[in-house]
């Protein structure tokens, strides 16, 4: 299964063999049988990649990644050299971009999911038992990873 990050560690604890393929390789890997399933993005992105042509089940919710954060990284010295006005422009532009991206993304998902159903994709939901199992394994992974000082600092 294509998976990444802590979610991959959870799936491995549940007996799943995971692979961290780049997004552009998912379709081909599914088509060739190199992987049987994939976690990736949201329904609109799945549609753009054509995943409905090869994957016939889509499970919700995405328990491992409740949101995606876009970021703009600016060198500290470059930031310090900017005027307060330019810093404010950049901050507000980023906020507006995030707001727009979230709103557009959420607005289009229902139509995209309806289209996926028309293309034969079954929309399924994880049972409460499966979500509890994911949570239990997630907690185990976090305890193990917390032995690393940097992980512990970031996670807490």
Can you annotate each of these PLM segments?
Residues 1-156:
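N-terminal secretory/targeting leader peptides
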